[in-house]
Amino acid sequence: VGNNDSNEIYKGILDGHSRSVFHGSIIVREKAAGVNANQVDKNLLLSNTAEADTKPAFWVYCDDVRCGHGAACGQIDEDAIFYLMSRGVTEEQAKRILIRAFVAEVIDTVENDTLKEYLQYVVENKLDNL
């Protein structure tokens, strides 16, 4: 259907020897003019052995569309940790704050309050076990 938006965001937090694979797929059909489609894959690597593979894909069969994609993969920003520690936060607390901020970009878009609270609970539980 034309004149619609599609926003696909995938976020991964990887530790140990974990590996994520993102293979995005957006198809814009012939009669879907006016579509705005976007794919984003962001990964936060908590260890030197974690891996993230990204392969965004678009199949566009009409004109008059806007499609974009992006990917980012990296570790926690050491400058951000230093800044928080200079404000009296421990290194572990700083890492948790930054991970929460990374996840919040997705959780904040959830409109269902029950689901949002559950997701926040899951994140906090995982952070407690880091």
Language-model features: where?
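Active-site gating/interface segments in enzymes
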Residues: 1-130
